[in-house]
UniProtKB/Swiss-Prot annotation:
Predominant localisation class: secreted
Taxonomic placement: Eukaryota, Fungi, Dikarya, Ascomycota, Pezizomycotina
Compartment(s) where it occurs, according to its Swiss-Prot or TrEMBL record: Secreted; Secreted, Cell wall
Full protein name: Class II hydrophobin 3
Superkingdom, natural source: Eukaryota
The keyword Transferase is assigned to this record: no
Entry keyword annotation includes Signal: yes
GO cellular component, one term: extracellular region
Gene that this sequence comes from: HFB2-3
Length: 97
């Protein structure tokens, strides 16, 4: 009987502990798939083309940091399909914004 109680307490403690990956998990900035390129763009033309785009400066871990990093350089956070020489094709708003 004591063994069962001790085992139940041990198992309950293990299950209640947070997993080590939960604290370090990073939410994706953009949808996986087509719109997977995080970009800071100056001009959006109806979501079809974005002009003067570049990768976000520094390290960004979530949508709020992505938006703040782009705003700091006077640009807008976007997720695009095809970045080519600062012009991006088919862009959308990042996840979480």
């Amino acid at each position: 009987m004591k063994f069962f109680a001790a085992a139940a307490l041990f198992i309950a403690g293990v299950l209640a502990a947070p997993s080590p990956n939960a604290a370090n998990s990073v939410t994706p900035l953009c949808n996986p798939g087509l719109y997977s390129n995080a970009q800071c763009c100056a001009v959006d033309v109806l979501g079809v083309a974005d002009l003067n785009c570049a990768t976000p400066p520094g390290v960004v871990n979530n949508a709020a940091e992505f938006q703040a990093a782009c705003a700091k350089i006077g640009q807008e956070a976007r997720c695009c399909v095809l970045p080519v020489l600062g012009q991006d094709v088919l862009c959308e708003t990042p996840l979480g914004l």
